[in-house]
């Protein structure tokens, strides 16, 4: 078996997660064309170092194809990042990217007492 990337939370105050589904037309594009659009997205993400981004495939686990998560201490930076990404070419190939779930980081030991 191949090695899988392990995503380790950075313990920033806010975690924003949402599923997304790409349109069929996305998969009909050449790999090179898709990569060019994703490179634009990635470049935009690098402009916001206060926001960590992780994308994971989830096809077959639920209705969505992928999940994306953002960790930040500055929700205003997340909003600026998403606003900029929504005007890029890859956005035209997104069929659905809701619901958006926003969480505040809590250590597990602090929340497990709620379930006793």
Task: Describe every region a protein language model picked out.
Residues 1-47, 59, 109-116:
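Short S/T/G/P-rich N-terminal loop/turn motif that feeds into the first structured element of a domain
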Residues 15-21, 60-85:
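Short, well-ordered beta-strand segments in beta-rich or mixed alpha/beta enzyme
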Residues 25, 75-77, 107:
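Generic "edge-of-domain/loop-turn" microfeature
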Residues 47-50, 73-102:
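An amphipathic, aromatic/His-enriched active-site/gating alpha helix that lines ligand/cofactor pockets
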Residues 51-57:
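A short linear hydrophobic-aromatic micro-motif
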Residues 57-59, 104:
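A general secondary-structure junction signal
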Residues 71, 104-113:
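Short terminal or interdomain "cap/linker" segment that borders an active site or interface and mediates
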